């Protein structure tokens, strides 16, 4: 049958941007589907149905690039945590990129890029990239990634594959499957990349504290002055404090 022929298709490269958090996707008709190798997706959310559908159609050396809502990185509801755990333990997750907000015209849902591979170069490791600070607002509501932003992400991934990448605090980290397991198989990049190191401005600590304390003292004085003026004005109209 046509369906049987379609189920036999195996692709080397798959790119997908399926609808986010789709409910009512026909789960009841696909309860024992062969594609659910890592667990049956919940009826109320198709994210892991899409993901497993793509994995099923992947050739032995195939790769997937997929956009999913951020909930998929950490959700435990409806068995999603177990499915994610099984996919991670199958060593399929090559890279996760947390994207900045406002990249879409039609939704504000924050998203991530999932890169999966059947035959990863870096076995037992996953690259996490936190790209939430990248991009430029081109209108009040829409952000775009510049060519430099895209190159930074691509270069980081290529260095990971080559085994030459060094972790960059606040941006990227290479993490073993064992360490992901210690984080309950949650794939949120922010958990792994840490906080960006702040550049030392060279001002000695004692001087900085002295300056900031002095500025705070001035602000307190101004605040007290304003408080007095407000009380006087309220008093003048018969509402004295």
Segments predicted by a language model, with ranges:
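Short, small-residue-biased leader/transition segments that mark boundaries at the very start
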Residues: 2-9
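A conserved structural/catalytic subdomain of Rossmann-like adenosyl-cofactor enzymes
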Residues: 10-239
